[in-house]
UniProtKB/Swiss-Prot annotation:
Region ranges (Disordered): 198-223
Example of a GO biological process term: translation
Subunit structure: Part of the 50S ribosomal subunit; part of the 5S rRNA/L5/L18/L25 subcomplex. Contacts the 5S rRNA. Binds to the 5S rRNA independently of L5 and L18.
Organism field: Thermomicrobium roseum (strain ATCC 27502 / DSM 5159 / P-2)
Matching InterPro entries: Rbsml_bL25/Gln-tRNA_synth_N (IPR020056), Ribosomal_bL25/Gln-tRNA_synth (IPR011035), Ribosomal_bL25_b-dom (IPR020057), Ribosomal_bL25_C (IPR037121), Ribosomal_bL25_long (IPR001021), Ribosomal_L25_dom (IPR029751), Ribosomal_uL5_bac-type (IPR020930)
Superkingdom: Bacteria
Pfam families: Ribosomal_L25p, Ribosomal_TL5_C
PANTHER family assigned to the protein according to its UniProt record, in alphabetical order: RIBOSOMAL PROTEIN L25/GLN-TRNA SYNTHETASE, ANTI-CODON-BINDING DOMAIN-CONTAINING PROTEIN, RIBOSOMAL PROTEIN L25_GLN-TRNA SYNTHETASE, ANTI-CODON-BINDING DOMAIN-CONTAINING PROTEIN
Biological role stated in the UniProt entry: This is one of the proteins that binds to the 5S RNA in the ribosome where it forms part of the central protuberance.
Assigned keywords, A-Z: Ribonucleoprotein, Ribosomal protein, RNA-binding, rRNA-binding
Protein name, entry field: Large ribosomal subunit protein bL25
GO cellular component entries: cytosolic large ribosomal subunit
Length: 223
């Protein structure tokens, strides 16, 4: 079995506004849900261990959450941040059935270099792909090799990207993932993306204490 980052914690008995005291003690409140737990388990986890694990695997890989001596392989499904201080307020963990595939969204990572005769700017039009795999087989990212591009081939579609063994593509295979564009077109696309990101960032979001959920994982168990 793949080795996972470890985060230690304990069952939480403090709720509501009282969880502020937990944070002052270096504990981050959260909850474990999923098919392997009969009912949601409120937890408090070590703040520094969680932050290290989150920065290392994000929402793309499993973390071993050890609660009172019991280990739960979990995905970090949602992290709520304070809208001003960006302090982590609450975490939702998802404990999957390791024997059943899950459908998740993972980021795209470009590797390799363009051939010298390919002129233009590489744009990632689809930064994430939806895939299906067993929880322990979910890759941290999907690599897209830029050396496959040429003067005749300026686009890479989702269905053309090689996937690791045991991983199936759920995204439409005809979706454009990477494209070589002229500089002016790339700048216009980048500006449109920036404006959209600012508009999304300005939208009000409801969560604990006005928190803004980040990195909400598109994750579900496959039928």
């Amino acid at each position: 079995m793949t080795e996972h980052p470890v985060v230690n914690g304990e069952r939480r008995t403090v709720f509501g506004k009282k969880v502020k005291r937990l944070r002052r003690l270096g504990r981050t409140p959260g909850v474990i849900a999923g098919p392997v737990v009969p009912e949601p388990i409120p937890v408090a986890v070590d703040e520094r261990e969680f932050e290290r694990a989150f920065h290392h695997v994000g929402t793309a890989r499993l973390v071993d959450l050890v609660v009172d001596g019991t280990t739960y392989p979990v995905f970090i499904r949602e992290v709520a941040l304070h809208p001003v201080t960006r302090e982590i307020l609450n975490v939702e963990f998802y404990a999957p059935d390791l024997a059943r595939p899950v459908t998740v969204t993972v980021p795209v990572l470009t590797v390799g270099e363009l051939a010298p005769d390919v002129v233009g700017v590489v744009t990632i039009q689809t930064p994430e792909l939806e895939i299906r795999a067993l929880p322990d087989a979910v890759p941290e990212h999907i690599e897209v090799d830029l050396s496959l591009l040429s003067t005749e081939r300026t686009v890479i579609h989702a269905g053309e990207i090689p996937l690791p063994v045991g991983v199936e593509l759920e995204t439409d295979p005809d979706v454009v993932v990477v494209v070589v564009e002229e500089a002016e077109e790339a700048e216009a696309a980048e500006e449109a993306t920036r404006v959209l990101a600012e508009e999304i960032g300005d939208r009000p979001r409801s969560a604990e204490e006005g928190a803004a959920p980040v990195k909400e994982r598109k994750l579900r168990e496959s039928e």
